[in-house]
Amino acid sequence: MQYDTLIQPDNGQAATLIHVTDKSRFEAWLALQPDAVRTAVKAQKFEGGANDIAILPADKTGEWSVAAGVTDVSASGLWHLAKLADSLPEGTYRLADYDASEAMLGWMLGQYRYHEYLSEPKLTGPRVLLVKEPARIAMAALQATATALVRDLVNRPAGDL
């Protein structure tokens, strides 16, 4: 996998918006949302808990956004977006009011798959995250590539090394 393609600089290109919240900020966030979004959130039983996601309707037909719960919005963490990257369909995403600098590596590693011994691997397209701080992308991609190599070695049977 080319990890350096999973995070791209945000140049205003089309992307699905991700709203990040946590349990303590959830009610305030929800109060600012339109009725259709509040109804969708309630129907999906989304409460802003860590690793919870909800698909939200948008004003235009065919468009949508995502609500994602993390442990603590104010303390960006490495793994905050990892499960989200694994759960979303392929596409391009942009974070609303959330600093992804600490979570870039987790976004990349959330898409790691070991397919070596699968007869029919289930391949999915990439989930690309757009970020405002492109200077950190290269280092996060190098760390993801190194971590994936270690994971590959751990997952490979000893007799095949």
Describe the residue ranges of each PLM region.
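N-terminal hydrophobic/helix-forming segments and targeting peptides
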Residues: M1-L161
